[in-house]
Amino acid sequence: MNETIDYNDQIIDSVPLDNLLPRIYEKMDSNITIHNYSESGDGNCQNFASAGDATGRGISSILTLDLLEDNFSFNADHILSNWATVYASGDVMLLAESAWNSWWFWGDEGIGNNEMTNIHAFDISSPGQTDYIASGRINGTIQDQFSLSEYNGNIRVCSTTGQWGRWWMEDPEPMVSHVSVLGLNSEGTVYEVIGHVGGIAEGEQIWSARFIGDIYLNKYIFQETLPLLLVHLTF
């Protein structure tokens, strides 16, 4: 068995990186040009980023194109991730993806990263270019792109934990919501939680959310009522 695994590992290691990545096909008249996603054809992967404990099997890519150029070219950055939710402000783009690659946690008493969300930030302030900034992780899962915000250099997120209704557990944690604020650490390499309000609206699910200036607004759906929650996020 070990010999088979070693043999398969050798085959995988010998495959060029570009053979494993998506490509862009440009057609001009009858000519087709293939563009690689890596920085160069020799398998350079410097424009790819991945969480140290990533479980995602896909690639989320940000492509920047100049539609006025005579010759087709693009700037690209990539995250190895699960299916991502995208948010963008004027200067920052966020990709938020589940830290776990499956929604099914049956029998998993040690939840671990199942309800965690990875958030990857990119600088889009320069036209025609994207630059990876850093990533962070928050507790809970998000509803949609309106659950995300970038404001004054910080990332703001509303999330929910326990919404999967773990019916197989005898006494599961109740469903609650959270508002988290993330800021870059002193080295500028990781987004860390610098503010958090948790335990919000026990037993209720986020229906919609908005961040407006220093204010976070949230609606929950519970039976036939729609309570509205406001949180002031000034530091």
Regions found by a protein language model. Give the residues of each.
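Beta-sheet-rich non-transmembrane sensory/scaffold domains
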Residues: M1-F235
